[in-house]
């Protein structure tokens, strides 16, 4: 005679000391709390928040073990957005790789592209040969991108806490920046505009006046956002003292970005390890000593103002000049004056290389189909993205394709802090803690 199996959550055996795990998912919070109150001694409740939950910043899964409404254990489940970008880079030439990396952290594509291109240029040994106009445009686009990314962080964080007005304000301002990106690169996201050795094309006519209009518009709009949230009683109650992580915790976990600077440490790669000429720009590294979600909010708001200062300096420094390295053996074969798409595909350019120079046609064909050859070696480069240190470890075997490219994405590293921030707190406060980290799952899973 066989004994029929009991229900999956039938309770533990007190004689053997085993615990019963009650897994609750997709139910109302009242039912979750009621189940916790009715749980017998020795029972645990594990709640799956995500990966489809609207308050987990994308396809992030939080596995929360709770007692009542208190989190006793928190773990992250990732990998739902894995796309194999790093592996795909090994099957594309060095220039084509830009179109892949720009899609990782999709809220800060210019940082992905710049970090990749800085690594390629360092392997080639041409970092000092990059035209000044290229570096100025790169810095300008990255700082505009920093503002747009922080706006999304504040907008989505506000939405998750019930501040719908903050979401409307944030996305309204972001649209203004994305319209500038679309004017310059042709796309709102996934630009592939920054290339090894330079840029895909020069700034179009009307881009600089449009950026100046943006510089005049955004300060007032940011002031409206600050007036809405800075002294808002409910906002402060939901963020002050929430998601606490001190300097020792950040150093132990390798945390960077606004989370690290909220402990009072002024660590910013733009100052610590300048790149693209950042040492020539005047700006402040914003810090706070709250170590909580509210401090990280204040840092992001103030960093947007510093980014506006840098963009204004970039506009003043823009001088006519080339936007691609002069070495024709390394430069992507494009006549940027004739090729409006930056790829040398204009009829006038094609007619010239095909009708006047057979050698030029052969060079064009070989460089486009095979790509540039990068000397064997390995290098690590890093930039300060909106979320922290975005690093790239590149390995070249001397061929036309990368042997290995690995990204150190700050969202991936910073998610290690979820347990330290959430355990011992309330379930509702986990939303504030994760929002203050601002993870982008495209960068986490890659």
UniProtKB/Swiss-Prot annotation:
InterPro entries: NADH_Q_OxRdtase_suD, NADH_UbQ_OxRdtase_49kDa_CS, NDH1_su_D/H, NiFe-Hase_large. It is a peripheral membrane protein. Its EC number is 7.1.1.-. It holds the Pfam family Complex1_49kDa. It is found in: Cell membrane. One of its GO terms (cellular component) is plasma membrane. One of its GO terms (molecular function) is NAD binding. It catalyses: a quinone + NADH + 5 H(+)(in) = a quinol + NAD(+) + 4 H(+)(out). Keywords: Cell membrane, Membrane, NAD, Quinone, Translocase, Transport. PROSITE patterns: COMPLEX1_49K. It comes from the Bacteria. NDH-1 shuttles electrons from NADH, via FMN and iron-sulfur (Fe-S) centers, to quinones in the respiratory chain. The immediate electron acceptor for the enzyme in this species is believed to be a menaquinone. Couples the redox reaction to proton translocation (for every two electrons transferred, four hydrogen ions are translocated across the cytoplasmic membrane), and thus conserves the redox energy in a proton gradient. Belongs to the complex I 49 kDa subunit family. NCBIfam families: NuoD, PRK06075.1. NDH-1 is composed of 14 different subunits. Subunits NuoB, C, D, E, F, and G constitute the peripheral sector of the complex. This is NADH-quinone oxidoreductase subunit D.
